[in-house]
Amino acid sequence: MKNSLIMVLLFVLQKGNSQELFVVTDPASNVPANSLGVNIMQSTFKEKFESGYNYHFMPEVTYGINKNIMARGTAFISNRSNQLVTEGGSFLVKYRFFSADDLNSHFRMAAYGRYSFNNSDIHQEQIEILGHNSGFETGIIATKLINKLAISSSISFEKAMDNKPNYPFPDAIGDNATNYTLSFGKLMYPKKYTSFKQTNINLMIEFVGQTINENGKSFLDVVPAVQFIFNSQARLDLAYRKQLLSSMFRTAPNGFYLNLYYTFFNLKK
């Protein structure tokens, strides 16, 4: 009986949330309570001003403390020094403070905070505490699911600090920014659910932007993606990030993401 209830839960989760598991942004929904998500995030970006590629390997674990609160830890590993080096990590907590459910739709809102530490060199004006800068970020996310379409948007404040011990933040560039995102996800397959074991195929497009508060310099990127979900537990993401416009100095704005994600449900029995 207990196993049957778990099966039903997985089916409901797949049917309701699969198309709002975005690649480069977080939705307002959380990892299910008492569940652990393991994500192997990889990105390869073309260097703009020199030959070669910037590779980042960022494993992360996410735990659902309860239905409204989740916590996440991420490690930062890159080839910035021409070899794979561990550069730091981050901790995130997200709190879902609003939820409204209907038969074929739901609306969620959440607030989050992230703190990161990083020892790599500071080499661009863009502030990115997920893999490049030490600092913190806090923001709000709103996500709407209507049938097979998910729409999510966020706004956040991000503050960069010194990359200790060797790289103080440069005085000549702004150290805080406003971030904004808009994401769309559409379930393309299956057309009709018959089992939680069905493979899901989602198409997504995400817009990611930032404005440095001190000087107004900005960028806007687009991220088209395809996503496969297997057996309601395993996920494969493939995405390409392309700079649409920018007035700030960025060393590697264009590149690919490959994410491998697995969720362990019902850890405490």
Q: How would you label these PLM feature ranges?
A:
Residues 1-22:
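Bacterial Sec-dependent N-terminal signal peptides
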Residues 18-162, 171-269:
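Transmembrane beta-barrel domains of Gram-negative outer membranes and organellar outer membranes
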Residues 166-168:
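Extended low-complexity, intrinsically disordered segments associated with secretion/export
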